[in-house]
């Protein structure tokens, strides 16, 4: 009887096994298309809101997507993305549901125009965030490419 109680206590107190959970992150430029490789991508980081633990991260890469599909609107629940549209794909191991925050910073190739957005959602073990567009964020801002001087150059006073 004592052995059964001990085994029961061990089973109840044993940590849940972590389940691989896929997450896809896409970033739209406000009023425009996906931010992808042509703009240097967008840095993304996933972290646990309660502990601050960084769970995964990387760079959104791919094409800017289908202009007609993105700009033409869509019925509720239909994806904006198409095959090859810019995305970051990762897998995190979750033993329990966690409140996850994604931090997105970009466009990487335009440092003078970089901005950061964050979003939070509960993610369940084994129940990925991949349906349709996955975790879709919108990045506000405007990129202006000055031809002369280039964005990384500075003018001397009086010129």
Please provide the spans of the model-predicted regions.
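N-terminal signal peptide c-region/cleavage motif recognized by signal peptidases
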Residues: 13-15
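Cleaved targeting-peptide boundary
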Residues: 18-25
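Short amphipathic, basic-aromatic surface patches that mediate peripheral association
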Residues: 25-36
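Short coil-to-beta strand junction motifs in C2/discoidin
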Residues: 36-43
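Beta-strand signatures of extracellular beta-sandwich domains
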Residues: 43-47, 103
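Tryptophan-paired
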Residues: 51-100
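Short acidic/polar inter-strand loop motif in beta-rich domains
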Residues: 94-115
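Short, compositionally biased P/S/T/A/G/V-rich stretches that sit at domain boundaries
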Residues: 122-159
């Amino acid at each position: 009887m004592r052995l059964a109680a001990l085994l029961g206590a061990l089973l109840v107190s044993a940590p849940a096994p972590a389940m691989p959970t896929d997450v896809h992150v896409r970033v739209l430029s406000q009023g425009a298309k996906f931010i992808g490789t042509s703009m240097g991508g967008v840095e993304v980081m996933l972290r646990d809101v309660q502990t601050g633990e960084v769970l995964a991260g990387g760079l959104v890469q791919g094409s800017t997507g289908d202009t007609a599909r993105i700009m033409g609107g869509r019925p509720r629940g239909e994806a904006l993305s198409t095959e090859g549209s810019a995305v970051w794909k990762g897998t995190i191991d979750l033993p329990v549901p966690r409140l996850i925050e994604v931090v997105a910073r970009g466009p990487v190739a335009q440092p003078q125009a970089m901005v950061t957005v964050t979003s939070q959602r509960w993610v369940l073990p084994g129940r990925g965030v991949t349906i349709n567009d996955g975790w879709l964020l919108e990045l506000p801002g405007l990129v202006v490419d000055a031809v002369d001087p280039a964005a990384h150059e500075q003018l001397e006073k009086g010129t």
